[in-house]
């Protein structure tokens, strides 16, 4: 039995160290000065941890039609932190939640990728969401405390600024 406990402890310690070394968590979006960085976030969600492998918002699998700007046809991916909030109806997304929305034309051509990333302390007045609008090639068109995003989403502030579905 002692060998089993020893093995479990060492295995757990090894996994923990790997998670720290490889930056699993929320630090991938920060630059060297600790500021939010759209290009670091892009690298994280396209190379280090490709968002196309993330689950989709439950009930929104595949393409679906939007009633809100900026796209008519959408695909919405969420990381595990966001999914836990959605499934367990936690009312507020946790630090590190990542929502990635692919926006398509009516002809299903990708034209924009919009991202909401929850970063504790980033913008308390805006529920700490960091907003980014990327072109499909990864160029950040808008980032940070984007007034256009906040002004649109403030209507659902009681749902942590998210239109897609209730998290309560």
Residue ranges and their predicted role:
Residues 28-54, 59-62, 66, 71, ...:
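Sequence context surrounding c-type heme c attachment/ligation sites in exported
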Residues 1-3, 41, 73:
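Intrinsically disordered, low-complexity sequence elements enriched in Ser/Thr/Gly/Pro
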Residues 71-73, 77:
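Eukaryotic low-complexity, charged/proline-rich intrinsically disordered regions
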Residues 2-13:
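N-terminal Sec-pathway targeting helices
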Residues 19-31:
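Bacterial Sec-dependent signal peptides at the C-terminal "C-region" and cleavage site
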Residues 11-21:
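Bacterial N-terminal signal peptides
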């Amino acid at each position: 039995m002692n060998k089993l406990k020893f093995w479990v402890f060492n295995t757990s310690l090894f996994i923990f160290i790997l998670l720290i070394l490889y930056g699993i968590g929320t630090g991938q979006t920060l630059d060297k000065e600790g500021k939010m960085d759209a290009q670091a976030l892009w690298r994280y969600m396209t190379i280090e941890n490709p968002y196309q492998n993330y689950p989709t918002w439950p009930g929104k699998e595949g393409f679906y039609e939007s009633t809100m700007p900026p796209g008519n046809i959408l695909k919405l991916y969420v990381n595990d932190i966001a999914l836990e909030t959605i499934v367990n109806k936690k009312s507020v997304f946790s630090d590190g939640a990542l929502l990635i929305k692919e926006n398509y034309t009516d002809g299903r051509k990708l034209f924009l990728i919009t991202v909401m990333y929850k970063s504790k302390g980033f913008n308390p007045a805006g529920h700490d969401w960091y907003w980014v609008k990327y072109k499909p090639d990864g160029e950040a068109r808008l980032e940070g405390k984007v007034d256009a995003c906040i002004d649109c989403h403030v209507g659902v502030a009681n749902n942590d600024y998210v239109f897609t579905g209730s998290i309560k």
